[in-house]
Amino acid sequence: MISADSRPRLARKARLRTDRHTGETLLLYPEHGLVLSPSAAAILRLCDGRSAAAIADELAAPLDDVLEFLATLGDRGLVTT
């Protein structure tokens, strides 16, 4: 479970990449990929040891939205704490 104090990071199997043709940010993992919205990409780029609360503060985003997004990816094994 991800809380405000959790320090989320991408799972080892997941990678963020920018598509050189479209400029879109992709979350790649074995045999799959997701095209991320700009806000989703910003959240994941800040998963560098900061707490979830610090990520929300940095982006001026509602903490509940950040936690929900990270929990969804956590359920898929793409984010760990």
Task: Give the role of each language-model region.
Residues M1-R45:
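Acidic, low-complexity/disordered tracts enriched in E/D and polar residues
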Residues H32-T81:
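Long, charge-rich, low-complexity alpha-helical segments
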